Amino acid sequence: QLLRRLLYHLRPGDTLVADRGFCSYSTLAELEARGVDFVMRNHQKRKLDYRTGRRLGRRDHVAVWEKPPRPRWMKPADYAAMPGQIVVRETRLEAARNGFRTRVIEAVSSFICPGEKTPAQLSSYYLRRWLVELYFDDIKTSMAMDVLRTKDPAMICRELLAHMIAYNLVRSLMVRSGADP
């Protein structure tokens, strides 16, 4: 539900990089309708068959996803508005980082033209998403923001806002002093 509320902030030409929990037909169809590109890890329940579709390379092809049955949470009007099929690129990526073991990731993306993005570029997108998560984790731990102390949703928003203000104040002081973070 949170993703659906945030979709309105995405503009045509933006690229959404997300994890496998968001890789559903309805999400991808809505992103395509908005003109938003995407790179997502494939959901573990969806098995990819690289022998079908238009082959772009080894473990890299363009596939057609058929519209699944309507989920219980979706309104019939929204389901009827979805296209009958969507065209996606399915790629097996090797995400390699120094000091870490290489991870093999099956990704789904909207970049279906082979010259548009290479598998290495798609892998780079996904790795940057992972680094952002690690950076947020570092910030939360170093500033003692890793545990939220309030339970009310409105107060949680205020607490998160206070943490972000404190973080930005520390960063601005670092910039003013000329110190390297």
Describe the predicted segments one by one:
Residues Q1-P181:
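Single, function-defining residue in the core of a domain
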